[in-house]
Curated annotation (Swiss-Prot):
GO-annotated molecular function: ATP binding; magnesium ion binding; shikimate kinase activity
Major subcellular site: cytoplasm
Gene giving rise to this polypeptide: aroK
UniProt-annotated location(s): Cytoplasm
Pfam families cross-referenced by the UniProt entry: SKI
Organism: Azobacteroides pseudotrichonymphae genomovar. CFP2
SUPFAM superfamilies tied to this protein: P-loop containing nucleoside triphosphate hydrolases (SSF52540)
GO BP, sorted A to Z: amino acid biosynthetic process; aromatic amino acid family biosynthetic process; chorismate biosynthetic process
Protein name, UniProt field: Shikimate kinase
């Protein structure tokens, strides 16, 4: 039985890395945000806006528990906030290997500026505002992220190099 949980801030590459990692390790792949969108037939931002953060975090927790109960031999890409609520981080650590994909503030900011249309929380922010948004959120979240079994530093390298460097650590 093998479960690998990828955690980290938005823009760290959890979904992209997760898909490739799963393929290389011959495991299944699931993205918790995608799973929630399919289950509830709504975008994450719509659930967040319509139901509130507390309700969304409960949904996220329920989906995480369901995935753990139903699937083995899988790479799971979590939402950026998933480890930071309830006992989700403890649950993931007890149920598999957790990998914090840690990127620098500069790299996260650069990636988020390039994809800001797809990220409603930052779509109206300037590059400087995005940088401070990332800094403020990371300060709160790193307490949880750093509880991961593996902290893997994402640098400006090819996806192939990232996977080749990550696989031996898992």
């Amino acid at each position: 039985m093998r479960r690998i949980f990828l955690i980290g801030y938005m823009g760290a590459g959890k979904t992209t890395i997760g898909k490739i990692l799963a393929e290389k390790l011959n495991l299944s792949f699931i993205d918790t945000d995608f799973f929630i969108k399919n289950r509830y037939k709504k975008e994450i931002t719509d659930i967040f806006a319509g139901e509130g953060e507390e309700k969304f975090r409960r949904i996220e927790q329920k989906i995480l528990q369901e995935i753990i109960q139903k699937w083995e031999n899988i790479v799971i890409s979590t939402g950026g906030g998933t480890p930071c609520f309830f006992h989700n981080m403890e649950l993931m650590n007890a149920s598999g290997t957790t990998v914090y994909l840690k990127a620098t503030i500069e790299l996260l900011t650069e990636r988020l500026i390039n994809m800001k249309c797809a990220r409603p929380l930052i779509k109206d922010k300037s590059p400087e505002e995005i940088k401070y948004f990332v800094i403020n959120n990371l300060v709160k979240r790193e307490l949880f992220y750093n509880q991961a079994s593996i902290v893997f530093f994402i640098k400006k390298m090819t996806m192939n190099d990232i996977i080749e460097n990550l696989m031996p650590k898992i």
